[in-house]
Amino acid sequence: MARSDLSKIKILSKYIYNNKGLKIGLIGGSFNPPHNGHLKIAKLALKNLNLDEVWWLVSTKNPLKTSKGQMSLSKRVELTKKIANHPKFKVLNIENNLKTKNSYVLLKKILPRLSNMKLIWIMGSDNLFNFSKWYKAKKISNLIPFAVFNRRGSPLRSINSKGAYVLGKRINSSRLKLLSISEPPIWGYFHNVNINISSTIIRRSKE
């Protein structure tokens, strides 16, 4: 991918080959709709991982979920911007800009152009159960560190899941603040979080 391809994304152009050492958390999802659980994870990541910013990556479509009942991309971006109203949060639809629908291709395209920065993938433990089903999951784990936050259920089940195995080595809980500057494959688990809300629950409550 040419440098100009990433430069077309206005909000990212200033980061290309710049901001050496800047630590960025990436929280991806359909955000259909975004909710306070997403916001809580983003804020916890910002604080506990010593991040400079958190980027909310609104996906065009989750390959593991049905598109039935999914709001338009523009509507989901709009709602996400409203809930992610924080000076250190940015809402992006990079998948749409770069014409891709999976995280592996997205990371392969942006990481070389943001090589002076430290990026870390943020997700809830519910996604950890399905991580082994992601497109080229093992290769993704070799590209970027992961921070996993406990959601609904036992942390033990998450830590022993197939997705956890694919992610590889788990960092000791006493060293979680170093996760964003650690070399992948590596991941960390934040136990002392319990987020019970989900986009699915919100959608069903409106039916």
Segments (PLM) and residue ranges:
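Nucleotidyltransferase catalytic core that binds NTPs
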Residues: M1-E207
